[in-house]
Amino acid sequence: MDIRAAEISAILKSQIANFGEEAAVSDVGQVLSVGDGIARIYGLDNVQAGEMLEFPKAGVKGMALNLERDNVGAVIFGQDQEIKEGDEVRRLGEIVDVPVGRGLLGRVVNPLGEPIDGKGPIQYTERRRVDVKAPGIIPRKSVHEPVQTGLKSIDTLIPVGRGQRELIIGDRQTGKTAVAIDTILNQKAVNAGKDESAKLYCVYVAIGQKRSTVAQIVKTLEEHGALEYTTVVVASASEPAPLQYLAPFAGCAMGEWFRDNGLHGLIIYDDLSKQAVAYRQMSLLLRRPPGREAYPGDVFYLHSRLLERAAKLNEDNGSGSLTALPIIETQANDVSAYIPTNVISITDGQIFLETDLFYQGIRPAVNVGISVSRVGSSAQIKAMKQVAGPIKGELAQYREMAAFAKFGSDLDASTQKMLARGERLTELLKQPQYAPLSVEEQVCVIYAGTRGYLDGIPTSSVRRFEAEFLARLHSQHADLLEGIRTKKALDKDLENTLKSALDSFSSTFA
């Protein structure tokens, strides 16, 4: 082997010339104190608010939140037991972001977008910051397309539109999550079709819930074939407060990808009360001044900047939409507490679920008297508007009369008729869990209720009437259901067909 001196000297010269070029510049700080998931750091002079930090020794990440004169207050996304005073902290030079796109559908992820379902890495081509500005006024359009929840009491009386924020509020164990899950399950039919503009992709954000509860929800979605168009973001009760705070923003970024690509997204925050509690915990540990109920002063802004990101965009911006269904848990039906009033004032309406109704067997336990949708009937198809108009008035009169009827025994015939009709309509609006109805089925059933076909049958037989009538429609009048689905209106021919179907069915019903 011959050694060429010229070659060796050339290599040495090039190495000396290029020496030190790849030396990475990193802004490094030191941990001053750590505890309760909060670290005080000295030395990160150029760090940005919301920037990701790394604690290399402990192998965990964090986020800078408090930028003070002589130190930085950071929250830790993980266990802080491994972090010691004097440990090195590095800036990562990026604001918290998550992967977005279709690759997340059918997956269960944590608030940093990392998979926790054991199905391998996530395929994505794009990442988005979790906390971005909401669309302005000019790119928006008024809400005019329906989100079909599959629940008669909501689709007829409190319609939700694409791009709307509709709050689901009630005490614990009143069926708030059940309403949200039914809404996801009901999208299976439209998502199975070819029309991308009709599809509704779902994001379910579980904040501060038990892992067993979340596992049950994921199992339900999987069994009903709904997980394939749904992303589940989980920050369970055992996760640190910063991750529970971050989860809704991460889910929102994933939902916004659909909105900004001309598609339709639906996001469920279950629930924002727990996010507010996590934010309160972080703020108090960071020594921010407390306000009402010890929440920080900007807890309203926390929820408003999140919910304002749900919007319906106009044609110039792709006509996409993101619909939000935030959930708030009340204590003893107290809607005048701080967080409930905040979120009620931000959203475009609310669905009140009541414990009393739930225990009376009225499920979903929607109080149709005080629930409201500020979008109203512009979020309904024409057929639903035609049949749902009378039911609102009749139920309102029934509630008023029922209160008076408690005191008087001798009621005139018209009052008795009104009470009987109201009872049957209330019974008609009941529905079992995980059994959403398509809009054409709802139109036919509500039509039967408001046109007096139920008046002659006992209240206890209303549910049986509905089930058997729908079975008859599917077996003998499939063209009627198809007509309502395609025309989205109840024209004279369809109405006559529906009337004759009801007449023949009610004459044989016993």
UniProtKB/Swiss-Prot annotation:
In the bilayer, the protein is annotated as: Peripheral membrane protein
Q: Which Pfam families match?
A: ATP-synt_ab, ATP-synt_ab_C, ATP-synt_ab_N
Q: Where this protein primarily resides, as one coarse class?
A: membrane
Amino-acid positions noted as binding ATP in the UniProt annotation, renumbered to this chain: G170, D171, R172, Q173, T174, G175, K176, T177
Q: Which UniProt keywords apply?
A: ATP synthesis, ATP-binding, Cell inner membrane, Cell membrane, CF(1), Hydrogen ion transport, Ion transport, Membrane, Nucleotide-binding, Translocase, Transport
Q: Name one GO molecular function term.
A: proton-transporting ATP synthase activity, rotational mechanism
Q: Tell me where on the tree of life, at the top rank, the source sits.
A: Bacteria
Q: Where in the cell is it found?
A: Cell inner membrane
Entry's SUPFAM superfamilies? C-terminal domain of alpha and beta subunits of F1 ATP synthase, N-terminal domain of alpha and beta subunits of F1 ATP synthase, P-loop containing nucleoside triphosphate hydrolases
Name a GO CC annotation attached to this entry.
proton-transporting ATP synthase complex
| Record carries keyword Transmembrane helix | no
Reactions catalysed, as given in the entry: ATP + H2O + 4 H(+)(in) = ADP + phosphate + 5 H(+)(out)
Quaternary structure per UniProt? F-type ATPases have 2 components, CF(1) - the catalytic core - and CF(0) - the membrane proton channel. CF(1) has five subunits: alpha(3), beta(3), gamma(1), delta(1), epsilon(1). CF(0) has three main subunits: a(1), b(2) and c(9-12). The alpha and beta chains form an alternating ring which encloses part of the gamma chain. CF(1) is attached to CF(0) by a central stalk formed by the gamma and epsilon chains, while a peripheral stalk is formed by the delta and b chains.
What NCBIfam families is this protein classified in?
A: atpA, PRK13343.1
* HAMAP family xref list: ATP_synth_alpha_bact
What this protein is reported to do is described as:
Produces ATP from ADP in the presence of a proton gradient across the membrane. The alpha chain is a regulatory subunit.
Name of the protein: ATP synthase subunit alpha
Q: Which organism is it from?
A: Caulobacter vibrioides (strain NA1000 / CB15N)
What lineage does UniProt assign to this protein's organism? Bacteria, Pseudomonadati, Pseudomonadota, Alphaproteobacteria, Caulobacterales
